[in-house]
């Protein structure tokens, strides 16, 4: 490898040793001054990349966990909303049935009250008619007793009272 130098110009071992010592000295200076900062910088960069990867992985896991929580919350909200809707429907149905039942009970009560009122009015009308007929009979009897009537007079008297009864009843 160095044979071409030896033939034509000669190899100076002193220069070679000097260059080798300078090279080794330069390597040592680079190691002391530059190598440690460069390796430290490279290590710091590797640590930062590793931390960034770990942070990204953690963020991805957190995001996935958050997505799962949101999906669970959404499912829970949907379930709760469905429960609320079902409860509202059931309550509405129950209230409707209660209203219908109450209305039927009110109608039945009104019907019974109307029947009682009708029966009372009928009883009052019958009582009034009895009283009127009794009064009329007493009046007829008293007039008959006061005078003795012939058959034609008696018939005319009864007809006049019946006619008077019809007029009073109409008014």
Curated annotation (Swiss-Prot):
Keyword terms: ATP synthesis, Cell membrane, CF(0), Hydrogen ion transport, Ion transport, Membrane, Transmembrane, Transmembrane helix, Transport
Membrane topology of this protein: Single-pass membrane protein
InterPro entries: ATP_synth_B-like_membr_sf (IPR028987), ATP_synth_b/b'su_bac/chlpt (IPR002146), ATP_synth_F0_bsu_bac (IPR005864), ATP_synthase_B_chain (IPR050059)
GO annotation, cellular component aspect: plasma membrane; proton-transporting ATP synthase complex
Subcellular location: Cell membrane
Transmembrane segments: 10-30
Alphabetical list of SUPFAM superfamilies matching this protein: F1F0 ATP synthase subunit B, membrane domain (SSF81573)
Name of a matching Pfam family: ATP-synt_B
Function field: F(1)F(0) ATP synthase produces ATP from ADP in the presence of a proton or sodium gradient. F-type ATPases consist of two structural domains, F(1) containing the extramembraneous catalytic core and F(0) containing the membrane proton channel, linked together by a central stalk and a peripheral stalk. During catalysis, ATP synthesis in the catalytic domain of F(1) is coupled via a rotary mechanism of the central stalk subunits to proton translocation. Component of the F(0) channel, it forms part of the peripheral stalk, linking F(1) to F(0).
Subunit text: F-type ATPases have 2 components, F(1) - the catalytic core - and F(0) - the membrane proton channel. F(1) has five subunits: alpha(3), beta(3), gamma(1), delta(1), epsilon(1). F(0) has three main subunits: a(1), b(2) and c(10-14). The alpha and beta chains form an alternating ring which encloses part of the gamma chain. F(1) is attached to F(0) by a central stalk formed by the gamma and epsilon chains, while a peripheral stalk is formed by the delta and b chains.
The protein's name: ATP synthase subunit b
Species whose genome carries this gene: Levilactobacillus brevis (strain ATCC 367 / BCRC 12310 / CIP 105137 / JCM 1170 / LMG 11437 / NCIMB 947 / NCTC 947) (Lactobacillus brevis)
Lineage: Bacteria, Bacillati, Bacillota, Bacilli, Lactobacillales
């Amino acid at each position: 490898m160095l044979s071409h130098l030896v033939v034509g110009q000669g190899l100076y071992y002193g220069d070679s040793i000097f260059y080798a010592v300078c090279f080794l000295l330069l390597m040592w200076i680079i190691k002391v001054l530059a190598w440690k900062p460069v390796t430290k910088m490279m290590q710091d960069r590797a640590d930062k990349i590793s931390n960034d990867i770990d942070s990204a992985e953690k963020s991805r896991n957190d995001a996935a966990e958050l997505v799962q929580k949101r999906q669970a919350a959404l499912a829970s909200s949907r379930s709760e909303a469905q429960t609320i809707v079902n409860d509202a429907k059931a309550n509405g149905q129950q209230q409707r049935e209660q209203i219908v039942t109450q209305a039927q009970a009110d109608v039945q009560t009104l019907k019974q009250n109307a029947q009682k009122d009708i029966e009372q009015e009928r009883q009052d009308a019958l009582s009034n008619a009895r009283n009127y007929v009794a009064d009329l009979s007493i009046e007829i009897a008293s007039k008959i007793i006061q005078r003795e009537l012939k058959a034609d007079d008696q018939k005319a008297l009864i007809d006049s009272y019946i006619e008077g009864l019809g007029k009073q009843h109409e008014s």
